[in-house]
């Protein structure tokens, strides 16, 4: 849209300067005849200023009406194209913070825009309600986590409503309710049946005093428990994992189909790593006896598996430290600092080859591996080790005369090229469920076990005879039992609910016990976007038809801190559901908007303690501690209670109004950048002035059109018509730019700037242009409609005022409907047909005298540019009657210099 940008720049720059320098226009109170559709319907008065009280009155009046408008869905709406807008749902902590306000202001603004564009929009809201914080908060208050959570949800729902945010509340979900976690359990069982959910021993953080497992977040920087203060120990426990590595290659490859994931694709790709190898499974033997245990090891060259010599493990491997039956044999063979051959044998479940396990001297294997398959044919290091330990092996790769490498001594893969054998062998391993999923050497499977109460119960029954058995689907949900007293100590709380734990095996009907771990809350949020498409379904997690209609999410908004883990798990579940034939789309999110933080000013003592503002002396050149006079380190950091740098959203809204805070958040920085919260900066005064200008412009228009004079466009003189034409061009340029920002880069700060510029241009119009010009009326209407998603309350009031004006000149607006129900403005076809323009600088005797617009296709034609300058208003004023000696047109810049007789 080169022409748009060029035409827009002609008007925006000087008008921006005028906007900053000019004081706001203030009108005295005046009676407006026939005013019947605004908050001033009783008196018909418009106040002289858009004061805080006026803002509050406007917002109070329009709040409920706007909410009702947003919630109405007609049969006609259901025929419109879909737009699925999703903002990351919050953990119900009990109180919204400014980060919530920012993300939900962004989603609300874009949702309103898309509705005005004629889209069928869902903008759902729910609650990520399980998790450790709720459990700990409930323990501290001697409450049950459920009552604490539900109370918080109720309060935060009211807060969202008071902020004027319009969500699709009919789609609300809460992850801690059985009607949701039933389907989380269902998906877990589907993963288990597909061989993608399994148990193995893994290291956990263990508090020896409280006798409980700690999350990483509960271990401080000194390695001590946040609660007891005890030194945290590492302990092996049997844990549940989801085999995310099985989808590593598919997810890595699918990133190429996500061009809109700016900045995030690289983070996802780095997290997954280079998918060049796979894991393969082995059974373990000691003294010729099968132990029944399994070992998984990685190789970057699975095609050469028939040349295996050993399986290497690191000294930190779980087999050496957990409860494995081979632990003693391995420890007996271990000599620290040396590569140690052990009596434990690994039997390939793919080829049935039997090789020894070697404990490596180096604790760090490649990537994040703790086990690796040794294949001398493809690794000089493996060759060195095999020869040093006297391990037999076969060379299985032969080079052809043409340089092609082929396999030998490799069963049915013999004669294949390495590339073909890689594909065939990994496919066979996957079919046998003994590994073969192409992945990297750094990606690990997802540990989902949590030894806590407040989470989704894992739907597995442990039977002495049958082993782990999934709960039958018809018996879901496995309801989280009520536990009278939670202490946060003593291991998994569910283990104390004996009536719940003790059960019958679904398979053999013998005595069994339920799994007492709960799921990581990331599992709940890994599929919630599906549930929003069909939130009341009682027969399945979601209906395929509805999911196929709404998915993928058109725009997903949330913090950049979730760009790796949450997005990875969500993508994994989506890929899995696709392979289960539950949905036709593999990727869940089309576009991402990772918004920045809102940071507050932090004042820190040399000791590291953060001070409240009331404990700081600001009278000197630099802030100091009021009590000790110590100098303070001043930084901008993420808002938090502990840093005393936060602001209460409700307090700040009460002080400035909803629309003002919305505009400040949108205008202060691009969405992806951090906002340094400081209401003394230009951003807040700027949006306050702009609202006043919108108010003044509308009032001026109403006054002109209700003065008793009928508008007659033919009465405008040529100069006034030119001004009106300029407004028409400016309006079209702004529509094009604003629409692009809303749909492409989401630079809503630029949207506000563009609309400020259009407001300033309108304020320069003469009274006759305001009265008689259809271009002025159209530009003002377009301005209010485009501002409506940003500031819905004030624009609703101003639009209600516009509808009172008699003898309207524009018939393409729905005058009997509110501003939020207007169609989004479009660029006039005549504007698109106009030639691209450049701003040609005009110099006279080397002195800059101004600029004129010149069609781009003639900008390098000196004769035509010369003629256009002479015909322009600027040329007639400065060159008419003067003797022009010569003119020079710059070949590099848009500049023409006239040398004239003095």
Curated annotation (Swiss-Prot):
A motif ('KMSKS' region) lies at residues 638-642. InterPro entries: aa-tRNA-synth_I_CS (IPR001412), aa-tRNA-synth_Ia (IPR002300), Leu-tRNA-ligase (IPR002302), Leu_tRNA-synth_edit (IPR025709), M/V/L/I-tRNA-synth_anticd-bd (IPR013155), Rossmann-like_a/b/a_fold (IPR014729), tRNAsynth_Ia_anticodon-bd (IPR009080), Val/Leu/Ile-tRNA-synth_edit (IPR009008). It comes from the Eukaryota. CDD domains: Anticodon_Ia_Leu_BEm (cd07958), LeuRS_core (cd00812). Pfam families: Anticodon_1 (PF08264), tRNA-synt_1 (PF00133), tRNA-synt_1_2 (PF13603). Its main location: mitochondrion. It catalyses: tRNA(Leu) + L-leucine + ATP = L-leucyl-tRNA(Leu) + AMP + diphosphate. The modification N6-acetyllysine is found at residues 67, 235. A motif ('HIGH' region) lies at residues 91-101. Its EC number is 6.1.1.4. Belongs to the class-I aminoacyl-tRNA synthetase family. This is Probable leucine--tRNA ligase, mitochondrial. It comes from Mus musculus (Mouse).
């Amino acid at each position: 849209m080169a022409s748009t940008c060029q035409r827009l720049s002609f008007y925006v720059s000087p008008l921006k300067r005028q906007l900053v320098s000019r004081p706001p226009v203030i009108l005295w109170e005046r009676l407006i005849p026939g005013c019947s559709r605004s908050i001033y319907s009783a008196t018909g008065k418009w106040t002289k200023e858009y004061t805080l009280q006026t803002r509050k009155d406007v917002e109070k009046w329009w709040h409920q009406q706007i909410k009702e408008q947003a919630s109405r869905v007609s049969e006609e709406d259901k025929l419109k194209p879909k737009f699925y807008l999703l903002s990351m749902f919050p953990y119900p902590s009990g109180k919204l913070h400014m980060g919530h306000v920012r993300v939900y202001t962004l989603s609300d603004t874009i949702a309103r825009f898309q509705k005005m564009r004629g889209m069928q929009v869902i903008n759902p809201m729910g609650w990520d309600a399980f998790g450790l914080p709720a459990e700990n908060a409930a323990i501290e208050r001697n409450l049950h986590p459920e009552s604490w959570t539900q109370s918080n949800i109720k309060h935060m729902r009211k807060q969202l409503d008071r902020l004027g945010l319009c969500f699709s509340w009919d789609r609300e979900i809460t992850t801690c309710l059985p009607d949701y976690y039933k389907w989380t359990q269902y998906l877990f069982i589907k993963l288990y049946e597909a061989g993608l959910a399994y148990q193995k021993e893994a290291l956990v953080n263990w508090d020896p005093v409280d006798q409980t497992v700690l999350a990483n977040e509960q271990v401080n920087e000194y390695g001590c428990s946040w609660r007891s203060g005890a030194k945290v120990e590492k302990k092996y426990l049997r844990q549940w994992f989801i085999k995310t590595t099985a989808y590593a290659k598919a997810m890595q490859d699918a990133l190429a189909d996500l061009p809109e994931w700016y900045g995030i694709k690289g983070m996802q790709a780095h997290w997954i790593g280079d998918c060049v190898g796979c894991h393969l499974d082995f059974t373990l033997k000691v003294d010729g006896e099968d132990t029944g245990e399994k070992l998984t090891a990685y190789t970057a060259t699975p095609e050469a598996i028939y040349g295996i010599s050993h399986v290497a493990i690191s000294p930190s491997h779980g087999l050496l430290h957990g409860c494995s039956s081979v632990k003693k044999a391995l420890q007996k063979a271990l000599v620290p600092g040396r590569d140690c051959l052990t009596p434990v044998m690994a039997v390939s479940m793919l080829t049935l080859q039997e090789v020894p396990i070697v404990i490596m001297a180096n604790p760090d294997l490649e990537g994040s591996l703790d086990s690796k398959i040794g294949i001398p044919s493809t690794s000089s290091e493996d060759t060195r080790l095999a020869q040093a330990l006297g391990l037999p092996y076969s060379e299985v790769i032969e080079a052809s005369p043409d340089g092609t490498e082929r396999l030998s001594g490799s069963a049915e893969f013999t004669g294949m090229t390495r590339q073909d054998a890689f594909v065939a062998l990994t496919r066979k391993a996957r079919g046998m469920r003994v590994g073969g999923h192409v992945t990297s050497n750094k990606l690990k499977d997802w540990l989902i076990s949590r030894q806590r109460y407040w989470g989704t119960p894992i739907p597995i029954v442990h039977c002495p005879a049958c082993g782990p058995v999934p709960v039958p689907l018809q018996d879901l949900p496995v309801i989280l039992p009520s536990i009278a007293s939670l202490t946060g100590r003593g291991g998994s709380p569910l283990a104390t609910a004996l009536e719940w734990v003790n059960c019958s095996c679904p398979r053999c009907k013998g005595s069994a016990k339920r799994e007492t771990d709960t799921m990581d809350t990331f599992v709940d949020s890994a599929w919630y976007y599906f549930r929003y498409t069909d939130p009341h379904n009682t027969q399945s997690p979601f209906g395929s038809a509805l999911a196929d209609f709404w998915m993928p999410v058109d725009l997903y908004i949330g913090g950049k801190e979730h760009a790796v883990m949450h997005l990875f798990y969500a993508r994994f579940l989506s890929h899995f559901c696709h392979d289960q034939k539950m949905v036709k789309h593999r990727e869940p999110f089309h576009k991402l908007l990772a918004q920045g933080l809102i940071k507050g000013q932090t004042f820190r003592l040399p000791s590291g303690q953060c001070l409240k503002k009331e404990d700081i002396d600001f009278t000197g050149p630099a802030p100091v501690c009021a009590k000790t006079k110590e100098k303070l380190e001043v930084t901008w950091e993420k808002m938090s209670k502990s840093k005393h740098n936060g602001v209460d959203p409700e307090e700040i809204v009460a002080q400035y109004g909803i629309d003002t805070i919305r505009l400040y958040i949108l205008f202060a920085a691009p969405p992806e950048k951090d906002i340094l919260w400081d209401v003394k900066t230009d951003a807040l005064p700027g949006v306050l002035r702009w609202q006043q200008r919108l108010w003044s412009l509308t009032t001026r228009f109403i006054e002109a059109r209700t003065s008793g004079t009928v508008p007659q466009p033919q009465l405008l003189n040529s100069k006034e018509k030119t001004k009106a034409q300029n407004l028409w061009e400016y309006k079209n340029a702004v529509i094009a730019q604003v629409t692009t920002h809303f749909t492409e880069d989401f630079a809503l700060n630029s949207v506000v700037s563009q609309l400020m510029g259009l407001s300033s241009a309108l304020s320069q119009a003469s009274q006759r242009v305001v009265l008689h010009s259809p271009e002025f009326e159209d530009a003002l209407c377009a301005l209010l409609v485009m501002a409506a998603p940003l500031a819905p309350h004030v624009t609703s009031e101003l639009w209600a005022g516009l509808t009172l004006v008699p003898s309207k000149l524009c018939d393409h607006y729905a005058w009997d409907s509110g501003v939020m129900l207007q169609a989004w403005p479009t660029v006039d076809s005549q504007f698109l047909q106009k030639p691209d323009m450049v701003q040609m600088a005009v110099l006279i005797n080397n002195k800059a005298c101004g600029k004129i617009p010149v069609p781009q296709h003639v900008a390098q034609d000196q004769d035509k540019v010369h003629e256009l300058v002479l015909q322009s208003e600027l040329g007639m004023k400065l060159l008419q009657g003067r003797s022009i000696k010569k003119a020079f047109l710059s070949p590099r810049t848009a500049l023409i210099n006239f040398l004239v007789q003095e």
